[in-house]
Amino acid sequence: LRVSRRDNSLKEESEHVKAKSFLAVSRRDEAFVILKQLAEDMSTPYGAESAYMLILDSYDKGDFEDVEKKVYAFSDSGSRQTYWLAKSFIILGDSFAERSELSQAKATFESVRDGYTPSGEDDDVLDNVRVRLAKLEEMITEQNNR
């Protein structure tokens, strides 16, 4: 059983590297086939990162409803991959801001800020949230002054 788990982990890592390599050389269609397969198991680091990358792709395409759907599915999956889940919620907050739903964006960012525990000193989640909250406050102030 230990060998099969290790084999699965190595295969998953290999597929993840392949997907990122495809992205690096603009072979997006091939990359996203692999990422979708990996994201079926969001409990693993590679599956969680793949889910995040699919969410980011939806955001980049301006498909904010799909962003919401995917982030909530990730959250409902029960994954313990909190870094990628938090990064996904940041994208969700960005999608609310893009739609001028500033109070919803603020609530989303504050939820991440208040509920997330960094996993190490290289963890950039809370820094990203702080920057977004500051920018959001500027946007809200500007909107209120109109």
Where on the chain are the PLM-derived regions?
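Acidic, polar-rich low-complexity tracts and alpha-helical solenoid repeat scaffolds
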Residues: L1-R146
